[in-house]
Structure formats: C-alpha cells, structure tokens
Swiss-Prot record:
Counteracts the endogenous Pycsar antiviral defense system. Phosphodiesterase that enables metal-dependent hydrolysis of host cyclic nucleotide Pycsar defense signals such as cCMP and cUMP. It comes from the Bacteria. Zn(2+) 2 binds at residues 61, 63, 145. This is Anti-Pycsar protein Apyc1. It comes from Paenibacillus lemnae. This homolog of an antiviral immune evasion nuclease may be due to cryptic prophages, or it may play a role in regulating the endogenous antiviral defense system based on cyclic nucleotides. Homodimer.
Length: 245
C-alpha cells in the first residue's frame, strides 16, 4: 500500500515562512500526524483539515516546534469532541512531555492531572517495528540531537527514513540503504553554519550521489530559495504538497 505524505510545515524552529516541520502521513483509511508544533493549528487550518480528521499523533522529541501545538489539540479533543486521541511516543518521552512541557498549561485539579487524562498514551518500543494502522508500520530509532535529551527518528514500512532533528549520522544512513532496503530519506537540513545539533547541507553533500537521489530535505531556514541548484542530487520537500512515498 502506497503511503502519502503532506508536510504541514518544512521550516526550522525559527522559520517564519514555512511553519514548523510537522507532517501528515496517511494511507487510505488512517492519518498520522508526525509532531505537532506551535504552528500546527494554523497549518491545518490553511489546508482545511480539522483535528477530527487526524486519527493519531506521534512525537519525535519535546522541543516546542514539535510539541507546542499539543495543548490546543488536547483541549480541543477533550472539550469539543469528548475523546482522547492516540499519542504515540517513546517511553522515555512520556514523563518529560507531561512534567516539563504540557502540565503547566493543561493541568486542572481533579480533571486533567496526567497525560493519560487527555491522550490515549501508547509507548512505542525502540528498534522494533510497530503497526500503527493496516498500512503504516514504523520503528523508532534513537538519533543524536541535544545532549541529555532523547530524540527519535522513524523508519516507516521497512523502506522510508524520516529524520527527527538530528546531527549527521552517515553510518546510519549507509546501513539503512545497504542492509535494510531504504529507498526514501526525508532528512532535516541546516542550510549553513556548523551542525552542532542539526545535520548540515554540507554534510549531506558528502554522501554518494546514489544516496543523495533518495533524499528530500526538510526543516530548513527561510533562505531556502538561495540554495536552489546547490543541493546536489537532493530535493526540497515543499510545504502542503502531497507526495506518494
């Protein structure tokens, strides 16, 4: 079954033009929201989609451009729709997502006292594929981003790598292509500067051309147009466009 991808946003954390790097991944009957940043509510509004049209949400890590829209999602589902949306995430993210991120805005004595009061929390194993729907299988892969904070990239349907925010890991990319038949790579990209917590364009350009041809770039800065024609064999993912994966 062919998956489809629609990026709600393709921008980095400080982008003003492209919204936060959040995505809809869907098959015929199921829509998964991958990350739900500050701009997700407006991004959904712009493509005429409601929270009700989403079947589940998955979080890769707890920075605001990836989780900042969860407070609205939780309140909308609880107060307006009277249901809890399934929330997929690594076990290691459950406590910090509530205690360090959502509790301050969502907590209501006797009503909302934990993440489970507003979401159906479904911890996912790391390094083992799990079926999210009949057409979507995914595996969490721990990847490096911020020291001391967990971040998880995704391996979808045994062939599609979707990077969380991560520093360059060429060994992982080569291993996925060589040993696991990966043929689509959706990769975050810092267009310029040193890659202390992100993967840079210069680093991705060191990959062989046959791998570059598999790569779609996302999580980029607002000066993206300045880099057209300077990204080797790679391509930019475009906001709101629907892709067959």
């Amino acid at each position: 079954m062919t998956l489809k991808l629609q990026m709600l946003g393709t921008g980095g954390a400080f982008s003003r033009n492209y919204f936060n790097n959040n995505a809809l991944i869907f098959d015929e009957d199921f829509t998964l929201l991958v990350d739900c940043g500050v701009t997700a509510p407006m991004a959904l509004h712009q493509i005429d989609k409601s929270w009700e049209s989403i079947d589940a949400v998955l979080i890769t890590h707890t920075h605001a451009d990836h989780v900042g829209g969860l407070e609205e999602l939780a309140f909308q589902m609880k107060l307006k729709h009277n249901r809890k949306m399934p929330l997929y995430l690594a076990e290691s993210l459950v406590e910090p997502l509530w205690e360090n991120t959502l509790k301050g805005g969502l907590y209501q004595e006797g009503t909302i006292m934990s993440l489970d009061d507003v979401f159906t929390v479904i911890p996912l194993p790391v390094g083992k594929a799990a079926d999210i729907s009949p057409g979507i299988s995914l595996e969490l892969t721990h990847t490096r981003h911020i020291p001391g904070r967990d971040s998880y990239s995704l391996y979808l349907n045994g062939r599609i790598f979707y990077s969380a925010d991560m520093t360059f890991d060429p060994d992982l990319i080569h291993q996925l292509v060589r040993d696991r038949r990966c043929d689509v790579i959706l990769h975050e990209c810092q267009l310029e500067g040193a890659g202390h917590v992100h993967t840079t364009l210069d680093e991705l350009l060191t990959l062989p051309e046959e791998i570059q041809e598999m790569i779609y770039l996302m999580h980029y800065a607002d000066n993206k147009n300045d880099f057209e024609g300077r990204i080797g064999k790679m391509r930019f993912l475009e906001q709101q466009q629907v892709y067959d994966l």
